[in-house]
């Protein structure tokens, strides 16, 4: 939607009007379970794109799309009556791709989790290629002092 608040408010109002009309006033038997997800308006408020989703298979999607196209005039006139704008925006219905995109992302996350589990299983049974601790540590004698810290001159003095 454009950046101005009037377009945002009008888009929200159009979304409410169209959703209410589809639920209560449109009696087309081809119309399935349609959900209006968003409305985007052009900057001049002349064209509104109504995004929708349909619950069901491809046949229900096709019949609901045809029902929306046939009810477009009635919906536009009702939008004009209820919004009171000088020029009622034209309505264009477009299937919302968000559910398909979400399903694709979820599938990618499932694949990544499966790969992570596979790598974790391999890492649990893996052995080090070299020593377990490859870093050099100073040698420690029995007194708890490291051999590097001891002064060699002290060891050579007679007691």
UniProtKB/Swiss-Prot annotation:
Record text on subunit structure and interactions: Monomer. Binds 30S ribosomal subunits, but not 50S ribosomal subunits or 70S ribosomes.
GO biological process: maturation of SSU-rRNA
Its biological purpose: One of several proteins that assist in the late maturation steps of the functional core of the 30S ribosomal subunit. Associates with free 30S ribosomal subunits (but not with 30S subunits that are part of 70S ribosomes or polysomes). Required for efficient processing of 16S rRNA. May interact with the 5'-terminal helix region of 16S rRNA.
GO CC terms of this entry: cytosol
Organism in which the protein naturally occurs: Beutenbergia cavernae (strain ATCC BAA-8 / DSM 12333 / CCUG 43141 / JCM 11478 / NBRC 16432 / NCIMB 13614 / HKI 0122)
Cell location: Cytoplasm
UniProt-recorded name of the protein: Ribosome-binding factor A
Top-level division of the source organism's lineage: Bacteria
MF-aspect GO terms: ribosomal small subunit binding
Compositional bias ranges of the Acidic residues kind: 142-159
Family statement drawn from the similarity comment of this UniProt entry: Belongs to the RbfA family.
Keywords: Cytoplasm, Ribosome biogenesis
Region Disordered: start-end pairs: 127-159
């Amino acid at each position: 939607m454009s950046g101005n608040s009037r377009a945002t408010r009008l888009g929200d109002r159009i979304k409410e009007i169209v959703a209410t009309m589809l639920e209560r006033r449109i009696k087309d038997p081809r119309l399935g379970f349609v959900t209006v997800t968003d409305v985007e308006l052009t900057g001049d408020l002349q064209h509104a794109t109504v995004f929708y989703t349909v619950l069901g298979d491809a046949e229900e999607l096709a019949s609901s799309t045809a029902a929306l196209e046939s009810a477009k005039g009635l919906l536009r006139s009702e939008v004009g009556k209820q919004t009171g704008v000088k020029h009622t925006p034209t309505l264009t219905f477009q299937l919302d791709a968000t559910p398909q995109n979400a399903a694709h992302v979820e599938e990618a996350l499932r694949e990544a989790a499966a790969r992570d589990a596979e790598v974790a299983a391999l890492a649990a049974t893996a052995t080090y290629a070299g020593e377990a601790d490859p870093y050099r540590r100073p040698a420690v004698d029995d007194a708890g002092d490291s051999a590097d810290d001891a002064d060699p001159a002290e060891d050579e003095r007679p007691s």
